[in-house]
Amino acid sequence: GMESKVIFIGPCVAKKTELYRSDVVDAIDCVLTFKELMVWLEQRGIDLSNCEESNFDEKPVRFAQLYPLPGGLIKTAGLKDDGLDTKLVRVDGFQNVKEIFHNIPKESSYTLIEPLFCSQGCINGPGISSIKNVFERRKDIIQYDRSIAGNDVVPEIYDEKIVKASYKKEEKIGKEVGEEEIQGILE
């Protein structure tokens, strides 16, 4: 109903600013990181280990759970990739993402660039709330994917609107700010 709200919950703090982009305005009401969700649950005295397990309302789209891993978008899109295809580029980590976008040749043969800002992908985002290391989290996601193998639900293709993001190399360097000015801003 009209009182319903859409909340994005994930590891990505960048989603908090994406919430205000003109192409998605009013699509999402609130963004929470996993850390914020855990704090909220704790404040309300909710212990997940005491909650009954339940299934998703709908079957998950095949491979969608791999999305937060490097190569996950490519796999979810149904593209064939063994990691050696020069037209499909998966890149993770700020420096690597910056490097690929600053060095794309004008006549590029790339079909798709999958940039994940966080090293090792979204499973290593700053909003993660897990005691497991990134490699254990990766293994858990892959095992979960394999546990639902055979579920070949493929999403419908929607003509309504295809959102496309483009990148234009544009360096903007502002004036240098001194320590005194920084302290003044923080006070």
Q: Positions of the model-derived regions?
A:
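Iron-sulfur-associated redox domains of electron-transfer enzymes in respiratory
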Residues: 1-184
